[in-house]
Amino acid sequence: CVDSDLIFNRTIDIFKDGKPNFFVSDRDQHHEPYFNFMDLYFGLSRQVDHTFINDFMIFDKNICAKMIPNKDHLVLAINAFMSDDCLLSEFETYGNYITKNHPDLYGSQLTKTKMYGRYSSEPWSGEEIKQIVDENRTEDVDLFTIHSWT
C-alpha cells in the first residue's frame, strides 16, 4: 500500500533477509483516536514506542483476512465508532497486530521523512509540486509527502 501523496526520494529496499520491512519514520506521530479504535474493535494496544504510519507498507492479505474475517462488520463498526476520538489507521492497526502476534515476520528500517501539507481548500498546483520535488532531490530524505487535509 502506497499513499498517493508520497514521493520516494531514493531507492528503498522493501525486503531484507527474505522478510518485508516495516518502515519506521523519523516523525513521531501518536494520534490517540487510532489507538482507541484498535482497542475497541481489535482489543489491541500499542506494542511499540514508534508509529507505523509512514505512508507505505507491505500488507500480507492472508493475515489481513484473519484479522478481519467479516469486512462488512468492520465497515459497520467504523461507521458506528467513528468520531474525533475514535478513528481507524490501517498502518497502526496492522503494524501493532503483527508486532504482537507475528513478531518475527517483519524486519524494520528507519526512514528519513519530510512532510508538506495544507488543507484541501487550497489545492496544490502542478508547479508547486514540481518545486517541492526539485527542492528535495538533493536533500537527505528517503521520502516526502504532499498532503491535502480535509
List PLM regions with ranges.
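Ordered hydrophobic segments in well-structured contexts
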Residues: 23, 95, 142-145
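A generic secondary-structure signal marking the coil-to-beta-strand transition
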Residues: 20, 55, 90, 140-142
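Short beta-strand-to-loop acidic/aromatic patch adjacent to the donor-nucleotide binding site
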Residues: 1-9
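Long, charge-rich low-complexity segments
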Residues: 28-46, 130-150
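Short, flexible loop/turn elements at secondary-structure junctions
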Residues: 6, 98, 148-150
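Catalytic core and acceptor-binding pocket of nucleotide-sugar-dependent glycosyltransferases
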Residues: 50-133
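Conserved catalytic core of nucleotide-sugar-dependent glycosyltransferases
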Residues: 9-84
